[in-house]
Design a protein with these regions (language model features):
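Generic short beta-strand segments
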Residues: 64, 133-137, 171-173
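Bacterial N-terminal signal peptides that target proteins for export
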Residues: 2-17
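Short secondary-structure boundary motifs at beta->alpha junctions and helix caps
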Residues: 82-91, 160-201
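Extracytoplasmic/secreted envelope proteins and their assembly/folding machinery
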Residues: 97, 101-105, 111, 189-196, ...
Length: 218
């Protein structure tokens, strides 16, 4: 019996050793974590255009969502179609969708087209809700110079009427000033500025479909 036990143990040793080597090999293939990556911000320039009139409406900016692959602080890039990769030493300070919400609210507020603009979650009753969805934010290295591709979907909702007034997708491309992560950040902010200007115009135009409770003020 002792001989049998020794054989069983000796048979298990090579298997355990092989498993340990396999795990070690897989670990070696994993990229080493970066302790102090370079952090970057989305911070588009202030929107310059002003609304033709101020409507007595409260606008709520909903929490933006992001499509899979872009719901992360990692900075995405592509070198060939359908293959999403991330920079190892550079990342966003927060996920782009989370940074987008305050920027959209600020742009709507600066345009001066509404009585007030609030961000979700809020206890303030709203007339309009602006939902946003980040479909794509990536630096494309398939062409030279590289370029940033930004796609954002905006939905305007009549809160009191419980209906969607309109949905529109905005798509912008901006050539990066340099073929690196920082060049992509610069291009992303320029593209975002244009998208926010278009989104503000869209939201103001759609708000005209709603009655307002007070006389508009100039």
């Amino acid at each position: 019996m002792k001989i049998t036990n020794s054989v069983c143990v000796s048979n298990r040793v090579p298997g355990a050793l092989a498993m340990a080597l396999l795990i070690a090999g897989c670990s070696a293939l994993q990229p080493a974590p970066v302790e102090n990556p370079n952090l970057h911000m989305l911070d588009a320039r202030p929107v310059s255009q002003m609304a033709p009139e101020r409507r007595d409406l409260v606008v709520e900016v909903g929490t933006p969502r992001a499509w899979p692959g872009f719901d992360t602080p990692q900075m995405a890039y592509v070198q060939r179609p359908y293959a999403l990769e991330y920079f190892a030493n550079n990342r966003w300070a927060d996920s782009p969708a989370r940074m987008l919400g305050p920027l959209l609210a600020r742009a709507l507020e600066q345009a001066g087209g509404f009585r007030t603009v609030v961000q979700a979650p809020t206890v303030v009753p709203a007339d309009l809700r602006i939902n946003s969805e980040l479909i794509r934010l990536q630096q494309n290295f398939a062409a030279r110079p590289s370029r940033v591709e930004l796609t954002l979907r905006i939905q305007v909702v009549d809160v009191r009427g419980k209906r969607v007034l309109a949905t529109r997708t905005f798509d912008e491309t901006e050539i990066a000033p340099s073929d690196d992560a920082y060049g992509g950040v610069t291009a992303a902010n320029l593209a975002l500025h244009r998208v926010l200007m278009q989104a503000v115009d869209f939201c103001i135009a759609e708000s005209a479909k709603l009655p307002q409770s007070a006389t508009p003020t100039q």
